[in-house]
Amino acid sequence: MYVWFEAVMGYYSASIHWAKNQGKPDEWKKWWENEDSEHYYFMAKDNIPFHTIIWPAMLSGCGYKLPYDVPANEYLLLDSSQFSKSRRHAIWIPDYLDRYDPELLRFYLASIMPEQKDANFTWEDYVTRINTELIGNYGNLLYRVMSFATKNFPEGLTSQNPVNLELNEKTKKAFDKVSRALEACKFKKALQAIMELSQAGNIALNDAAPWKQVKADREACETTLVQFLNFCSSLSVLMSPFLPESSQKAWDYLGKDSKIEDLGWNSALDHQDSFELKQPLPLFTKLNMEEILEKEMPPEETNELANVKPEVTFDDFKKLDIRIGTIEKVEEHPNADKLWLLDVNFGGPVKRIVTGLRGIYENDDLLGKKLSLI
C-alpha cells in the first residue's frame, strides 16, 4: 500500500478510535459527515500534494466532508540549514521545556512563521525578540499598568468614563485585523497586529503619564488607569490564542473570575467601569543572551571520530586475501537501472560482480580498468 494513502487515513481512523475510547462510538461523525464542519490541515509545502489530491479523492470516494483549508508553510530552518534528527541538528522539545517557558517558544515561532518564505530560527534572534518585543513591548505594558494601579489604588478603581476613545478606536481596528488574519490562518500577521496595538498602548500610557496625574489629580488618574486596564483586558483576549497561559494569568490579575477560553471572541471589545485587582507579577522573565548561547550553541566541530575501533596490526592486515583483477566485460543489469554486471579476470576463473557504478561510469570507462577485491 502506498505510504501516503495509508498515512492520511490516520486522520480518519484516529477519530474513530478516539470516539470509541470516549464511549461514544458515533461521535466521529460530527466531523466527517457534518456539512458544517471545517477541516484544516497544517503542514510544510512538501506535503501539499498528498493533502490536496490524494486525501480529498479518498474522502470524496467515501462521501465525507472535504478539507476546508490546507494552510501550508515554507520551511523553518535552524541556523540557515534544515532540521535533521540524524545529524542531531534540531531543537529537542523535552530539553527545551526543561529549561524555558513554552509560551516563549509559541510567541517566537508565531512571530517568524514561514508563511511566505523560509524562516530561520537562531538563538540570538530568539532572545532578542523575546526581550524586546514580548517582554519590552507587551509584557511591560501590562505589568506597568497593573502594578501601578494596585500600588496607588489598592482598594480598587472606579470611573464613569472607562473608555479611552482613541485607544478604543485602535483596538476595534486591531480586533478586525486580527480576526481576519486568524480566519485566514495568517498567524504571523495576526500577532503583528496585536504587537502594533500594544506598542500604541505604550505610547499612549507615556503620554497620559498617570505617575504625574496621581500627584495632581487622583480622580483623573483613576479614570486613566481604568481606561488602560480595559485596554489590557482587550490585549489579553487578543493574545490568548498565542499565549493561553500568560493571558489567563493577566486576566486573573485584572480581577476576572472567568476563563478566557470560555469567553466569546467579542469579549475583547468589552469594558467595565471598576476593577479590583490582584497583586500582579511580571508575566515573563527577561532572558540572558550569554547564558542561553552557552547552553544552546552546538559544540565546535572536531575531526575526532566517536567510538573508533582500534587499528588492526600489520600481521592482521597480511592475512587478507586481496587480489587485483581486470574488467574484461561490462553489461547492463536486466532488472536494475543503476547496476552494471562486470566480468573480472583475477588470473583464474573469470568472476562476475554486480556494482552500483552505473550512472557514474560509462561502459567504456570501466573496460580494461583494474580493481581490487578482498
Q: Would you name each region that the model predicts?
A:
Residues 1-151, 192-194:
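Structured secondary-structure scaffolds
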Residues 17-28, 142-178, 198-217, 299:
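Conserved, charged catalytic cores of large soluble enzymes
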Residues 118-123, 172-180:
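Short, charged/polar, low-complexity loop and linker segments
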